[in-house]
Swiss-Prot record:
HAMAP family: UPF0213. Residues 6-81 form the GIY-YIG domain. Belongs to the UPF0213 family. This is UPF0213 protein in potE 3'region. It comes from Serratia liquefaciens. InterPro entries: GIY-YIG_endonuc, GIY-YIG_endonuc_sf, UPF0213_domain, UPF0213_GIY-YIG_endonuc. Signal peptide: none annotated. PROSITE patterns: GIY_YIG.
Amino acid sequence: MTDTLSPWHLYMLRLPNGMLYTGITTDVERRLAQHQAGKGAKALRGKGELVLAFHCLAGDRSKALRLEYRVKQLSKTQKERLVNHPPLTLDHLLPDAEIKTG
């Protein structure tokens, strides 16, 4: 299911109530479909339509996990800024790793 050779992605989903959910995966489309089918994170079940708000390459699994942690520590305002004005890289979140957005 999670090929260690596949690149990992960080993604953010917008819930109908405006909340942003952050996760990592090797296949964004597959993971979004799982969430929408109610087979993903329990926190998203029954929350309504989920919209992919942001995604970026995150490198290997280790970097993706660290990036996910850092993004989850951001305030709602900082997350909205990331979604609405994606930077070219997320290097400022993980100074030791180059993370490309887009």
